[in-house]
Curated annotation (Swiss-Prot):
PANTHER family: LOW AFFINITY POTASSIUM TRANSPORT SYSTEM PROTEIN KUP (PTHR30540:SF79), OSMOTIC STRESS POTASSIUM TRANSPORTER (PTHR30540). Responsible for the low-affinity transport of potassium into the cell. Likely operates as a K(+):H(+) symporter. It comes from the Bacteria. The gene is kup. The lineage of its organism: Bacteria, Pseudomonadati, Pseudomonadota, Gammaproteobacteria, Enterobacterales. The keyword Transport applies. This is Low affinity potassium transport system protein Kup. Keywords: Cell inner membrane, Cell membrane, Ion transport, Membrane, Potassium, Potassium transport, Symport, Transmembrane, Transmembrane helix, Transport. It is found in: Cell inner membrane.
Length: 622
């Protein structure tokens, strides 16, 4: 490691604490309270407290430390992570049928994220604001309005970017974790007996004593590890080493101390179960703690919102969601983006959730199903990568998968008990997103196949035009083409109706590669097809936004001079009608038509000046 890297490591690690660990770092606000609140039939008693603490600690070790930080984070695509990245990696060296199954798993995992993300900001901010019940019980009626006000301000600042306030995230979250550790240590010193719960036998004893009830209670324990998937998704921003270093040096010790501190408090004062986190603090510290807790939950919510923006952009670029307006809020950091439609849809959903559920305890009942479902899918996809891409021994990989599923499946099954009490919400939202993504992908493929099934050979058409050219007019024409070897619809219709062709014709294809970024050296490939025809293929990664002006600049560097304001861009505009279909495919077709009508137009996607665009319409039956 270079000196520069050594000097920057503390800064990167601090930044990772500020962004990556917001969700899991605010879990102590509500996790132990939900475990011991009485909903599972046992109260605050020694065996239950020790059992839950042991389960929480060893889940943090096994799921976060071993599974995600040690194993899953090995699977990266040019340093990037996330469930869709894992899906892409897993499908590289498998058969077509297996790849299809892996794609479905990846899309379900991505859809689950959309379902869970509606709950995370609501439960985080509400659990912090609920500290008012301890500070000033008469203000408890203000919890819902204040939660909505805080989140409204958060969603409103998204369009301005978070670069400025983002600099404060790291020191605030570091302060938060130090407070977690300090409060917990203070309580543990007063009752060190609680440290016996570090022994995993207490978790075993918990299952043996409480039997079926203990299994159902796993639905509350899982609240302690929500946010684990974010570690993998944010790997590209901070790097594996920084995320691991932050976890083992700051986050894990702080969480452990705080959970065990809450346990020590409950052993001495069972009545503290109404809010064990805030009751850890002395009276004089309650208001400052309430403020820092609110800030920490806002930061956790911001991390989730940014994650939704990133996942949406990746899904759009990979062709699973319709094109939509994506705004870059930072000239320095390509990952800082703002998607207005997603932002305000998420805001409306979060407000509805807060008003409907009214208390974080009610929201906890809806939390966990999507998280644990994603955990199961991550285990399957990551072990597939280990076998197919890393060529690990199949028996060793099978043992790893069995070990992961022995934890993931019980957690997921236990959370199914929440289905009627709120778990239906993330599942419903996830199902809607899965239908939307699969509909857009499959119907888009159907449309392209329909448009080009009777197409002639591109090479034959160019040869014919060069041999018997139509009237040529001065200038350059660019025809956008979705596929490399097919004749653009706009070109055929221009020849059919206008019977003219520009002196120079460029067939431009913008391609998304299976990588987050494409090096500038490989950005543009130029091929001269004839004296007057050129093919330009511009490649972009799924974390990049295509820009035609940049493509023209690259073409100029390679000898094909193009000027944006002297070029005409011909594009086809399809008017779609539904053909004869079974009723269920007809419903899917209607959904696709709705998505198509609201999709961002190509000139806006690629930042082409509107006065240089000529759209030629055609009717296509799908």
């Amino acid at each position: 490691m270079s000196t520069d890297n050594k000097q920057s490591l503390p800064a990167i690690t601090l930044a990772a604490i500020g962004v990556v660990y917001g969700d899991i770092g605010t879990s102590p606000l509500y996790t132990l309270r939900e475990c011991l609140s009485g909903q599972f039939g046992f109260g605050v008693e020694r065996d239950a407290v020790f059992g839950f603490l042991s389960l929480i600690f060893w889940l943090l070790i096994f799921v976060v430390s071993i599974k995600y930080l040690t194993f899953v984070m090995r699977a990266d695509n040019a340093g990037e992570g996330g469930i869709l990245t894992l899906m892409s990696l897993a499908g590289r060296n498998t058969s077509a049928r297996t790849t299809s199954m892996l794609v479905i798993m990846g899309l379900i995992g991505g859809s689950f994220f959309y379902g869970e993300v509606v709950i995370t900001p609501a439960i985080s901010v509400m659990s912090a604001i609920e500290g008012l019940e301890i500070v000033a019980p008469q203000l408890d009626t203000w919890i819902v309005p204040l939660s909505i006000i805080v989140l409204t301000l958060l969603f409103m600042i998204q369009k301005h970017g978070t670069a400025m306030v983002g600099k404060l995230f790291a020191p605030i979250m570091l302060t938060w974790f130090l407070i977690l550790a300090g409060l917990g240590l203070r309580s543990i010193i007063a009752n060190p007996e609680v440290l016996h719960a570090l022994n995993p036998m207490w978790a075993v004893h918990f299952f043996l004593e409480y039997k079926t009830v203990s299994f159902i209670a796993l639905g509350a324990v899982v609240l302690s590890i929500t946010g684990g998937e974010v570690l993998y998704a944010d790997m590209g921003h901070f790097g594996k080493f920084s995320i691991r270093l932050a976890w083992f040096t700051v986050v894990l010790p702080s969480l452990t101390l705080n959970y065990f501190g809450q346990g020590a408090l409950l052993l001495k004062n069972p009545e503290a179960i109404k809010n064990p986190f805030f009751l850890l603090a002395p009276d004089w510290a309650l208001i400052p703690l309430l403020i820092i807790a609110a800030l920490a939950t806002v930061i956790a919510s911001q991390a989730v919102i940014s994650g939704v923006f990133s996942l949406t952009r990746q899904a759009v670029r990979l062709g699973y969601l319709s094109p939509m307006r994506i705004i870059h809020t930072s000239e320095m950091e390509s990952g800082q983006i703002y998607i207005p439609f997603v932002n305000w849809m998420l805001y409306v959903a979060v407000v509805i959730v807060i008003v409907s559920f009214e208390h974080s305890s009610n929201l906890a009942a809806a939390y966990g199903i999507a998280v644990t479902g994603t955990m199961v899918l991550t285990s399957i996809l990551s072990t597939t990568v280990a076998r197919q891409n890393w060529h690990w021994n199949k028996y060793f990989v099978a043992l790893i998968l069995i070990a992961f599923l022995c934890v993931d499946i019980p957690l997921f099954t236990a959370n199914l008990d929440k289905l009627l009490s709120g778990g239906w919400l993330p599942l419903s939202l996830g199902t809607v997103m899965f239908i939307v993504m699969t509909t857009w992908k499959s119907e888009r493929f159907r449309l392209l196949r329909r448009m080009h099934e009777h197409g002639n050979s591109l090479e034959a058409m160019i040869a014919s035009l060069e041999k018997s050219p139509p009237v040529r007019v001065p200038g350059t024409a660019v025809y956008m083409s979705r596929a490399i070897n097919v004749i653009p619809f706009a070109l055929m219709h221009n020849l059919k109706h206008n019977k003219v062709l520009h002196e120079r014709v460029i067939l431009l294809t913008l391609r998304t590669e299976d990588a987050p970024y494409v090096h500038n050296v490989r950005r543009v490939q130029i091929e001269q097809l004839s004296p007057t025809f050129w093919r330009v293929v511009a490649s972009y990664g799924w974390r990049e936004t295509p820009n035609v002006e940049e493509v023209f600049h690259r073409c100029g560097l390679e000898g094909l001079s193009c000027r944006m304001m002297e070029t005409s861009f011909f594009m086809s505009h399809e008017s779609l009608i539904l053909g004869k279909r079974p009723w269920y495919l007809r419903l899917r077709g209607k959904l696709y038509l709705l998505l198509q009508r609201n999709a961002l137009r190509a000139p806006d996607q690629f930042e082409i000046p509107p006065n240089r665009v000529i759209e030629l319409g055609t009717q296509v039956e799908i």
